[in-house]
Amino acid sequence: MPQGITKTSNQIIPEVLAPMMQAQLEKKLRFASFAEVDSTLQGQPGDTLTFPAFVYSGDAQVVAEGEKIPTDILETKKREAKIRKIAKGTSITDEALLSGYGDPQGEQVRQHGLAHANKVDNDVLEALMGAKLTVNADITKLNGLQSAIDKFNDEDLEPMVLFINPLDAGKLRGDASTNFTRATELGDDIIVKGAFGEALGAIIVRTNKLEAGTAILAKKGAVKLILKRDFFLEVARDASTKTTALYSDKHYVAYLYDESKAVKITKGSGSLEM
């Protein structure tokens, strides 16, 4: 049995591990790193948010010569979203800490980080998948991407991100040919982490959370992540069993803030494989 004085290096210290968990989380994010984070509600009472959300004003219309161009109303609607709490708990015995292979304490932290990262990412993806703008197109083709971009009806392109299955991303890269820009050539001014490259002004991010044939094209500001409370870490000691439990939680909600800034791409029956 190890002898000597117990030092801080042998213990689980929340103040040290909390920032470490945050670092583990940020490395794994794909969708959540794209969301705009709002922390203004931290410390405020209540668990249900009533928030404004922009409503898409409709596609452009054909106007005959000499006729007035109709004006559409840009509306906001009130929506509600209930704050969610996600949590993770692990427990480890003194025997495991003292005699376990590898680094059980470090693995606890890693597992907490991965668990939170996946849940937050999934919730942001769920919000994006609720996009009101949709298009049936083959996203493995450059003209399929162009069809999605056209849904924005922009005169001047704004920064946008294409979230796409890795297999589809490879096919799109091949079809884009000289219209594809490698990630190493994009510089530091990228609006999202994990860029694979760029085509037609869209930063391409690969993710296995989307099935082949399905993709999301979104502009910054499409989705928001409201934080009620960020990571909170607690340690509970059970002397009777000589175990130390680690608990972490986070309170937040992800929602589609601007419907006009997200397009869901699916490969419908009208899209032919070439």
From Swiss-Prot:
One cellular component (GO) term of this entry: viral capsid
Signal sequence, renumbered to the chain: none
Compartmental location: Virion
The entry's keywords: Capsid protein, Late protein, Virion
Pfam families: Phage_capsid_4
Known role: Assembles to form an icosahedral capsid.
The protein, known as: Major capsid protein
